[in-house]
Amino acid sequence: MLKIGIIFGGKSNEHSISVVSGCSIVKNLNKLKYEVLAIYIDKNGTWYEVLDDIANMPNYKLGEEPINLKKIENIIEYLKQVEIIFPVLRWKD
């Protein structure tokens, strides 16, 4: 089973759109084929692992943020466990 990291959020003015898009991708990936890690970047640039089971949650709406988060202290080390990275980010405006 491939381990995929979906990265969303970030410092952009379109932060909320990235959150909605990232959560949609997490919810729709085939969990029989992929182990999915949802990785959220807040508006200050801090990285978090999303501990919420996004696949079983209602759709995130614009302006909402994941609630149950664990801060990632060293993103380079953290990403070593991931085989594929899928960034769902916008450039900072």
Walk through the language-model features, giving the residues of each.
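ATP-binding N-terminal substructure of ATP-dependent carboxylate-amine bond-forming enzymes
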Residues: M1-D93
